[in-house]
Amino acid sequence: MDRSLFLNTKLTDDQVALFYLGQEGFLIKHKETYILIDPYLSDYVDQNCYTETVKWIRRYPAPISAEEFDFVDYVLCTHAHFDHSDPYTLSKLAKINSKAKFIAPKPIKDTILSYGITEERFIDALADEVLELNGCQVIPVPSAHEELRTDENGDYYDLGYKIILGDTSIYHAGDCCIYDGLTKRLMNTDVLMLPVNGRSYYKRYVEDIIGNMTCEEAIILAKETNAGMIVPMHYDLYDCNRINPALFVDCLFSMNPMQKFHMFAPGEFYIVQK
């Protein structure tokens, strides 16, 4: 996978291309606008979070290096965890791409700036406050990474993003569990990108791994919101925090066999057209 794949993929005005970079990382292309979400293109977690009890070892290398993204317009981060706001990846992007703007929850602004992003290139993301960007709209949506967390001003630490590209709507949840009010925010979304690795008491309180929605919850959410398609994510990179994707497929066929879905391999792309 290299930059030519992104740049040479031809789209009609009503098409959106999704390129999978691993974990929850995606590049989205619409017309000539390029949006990176949660790019994790290093082994920062392996180097800095590995312990005797929890062994973080990537199951596959990043399909592309951060240096290839000198053309990207916007970089969106959903929260501060290193596999979503990667210091190595973000610092490289800031150096090689002078035009990119970085968007992240306002409470983690100082963290993102510490990776080499200048203040004038940072855009605060606040829940439900629409960002009018070049060629698209971005609507930040609160995410419950097991729970909803806010700072002293009531601003959310964890966000997902609903992105409107022409007539196509895409929701990237970041790390998220179901909470009251989420369904209403996501009605009739064309593509739901949802973390499906689940959660458990032992992971949370013994291994300090904060969880996400289960496969069953993701499928119910898609049905309740009348989603066009589900893209499961956050299930494949680390053995200590993944699931067998066959579980998702089995649940889907049992619970809602008519639901469209796409399961990505790292480096794969898919074109969405309504």
Regions found by a protein language model. Give the residues of each.
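Metallo-beta-lactamase
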Residues: 1-13, 104-167, 253-273
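Pre-active-site segment of Zn-dependent metallo-hydrolases
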Residues: 3-9, 33-77, 88-92, 148, ...
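Conserved beta-strand hairpin/beta-sheet module of binuclear metal-dependent hydrolase folds
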Residues: 11-65, 154-173, 191
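Divalent metal-coordination and catalytic microenvironments
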Residues: 28, 38, 79, 86, ...
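Conserved catalytic scaffold of divalent metal-dependent phosphoesterases
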Residues: 38-44, 128-130, 135-146, 189-201
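Active-site environment of divalent metal-dependent phosphoester hydrolases
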Residues: 44, 81-85, 109-111, 129-132, ...
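Active-site HxH/HxHxD metal-binding segment of metal-dependent hydrolases
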Residues: 45-49, 63-131
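Cap/insert and terminal regions of metallo-dependent hydrolase folds
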Residues: 101, 107, 179-266
